[in-house]
Amino acid sequence: MVQAFVNTVDVENGVEELTNPGQLHAALTRVGALDDGAPALTPADLRRALAVREALRALLHANVGLTPDPAALKLLDEVGSAGAFAVRFGADGSPTLAPKASGVDGALGRILAVVYSSMVAGTWSRLKACPRDVCGWVFYDRSRNSSSRWCSMSVCGNRTKMKRYRAQAVAR
């Protein structure tokens, strides 16, 4: 859910999937954060969701060793508060964290509940945002020791290493 939501923009190619409230509604429904019959979203909802998406990307950068922006963390705190969470128990008795809010606050709250649950489960550190400044693509690190840094070593990893090599060569 988190990966699909954050990857609704291709930073490198400048392709934005969420350009209007209807597209936001469709995307949040597709990732399971918004119920199918939820009311239409507004331009303000779109602005809030885009800000949260980038705050999540900043949080995911921490999983590759970068420090998240304090403003991004503050926004995520505000969204978490707006979600007003409750513990819900499924038919099998397993607990889940669910927002009491509806609309965009509820949808963004569901996404944050997934973040929280994956942190508690110990799987959050495997979801990462590519640290290459023009990329930021979110990927799941499937390496044995969770050491992947780039969304693609053959693309972003090589480009970054080549850029560093050239800078060192010029400095010599």
For the regions a protein language model found, what residue spans apply to each?
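BZIP DNA-binding basic region
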Residues: 110-164, 170-172
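Short helix-coil boundary/hinge micro-motifs
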Residues: 1-129, 136
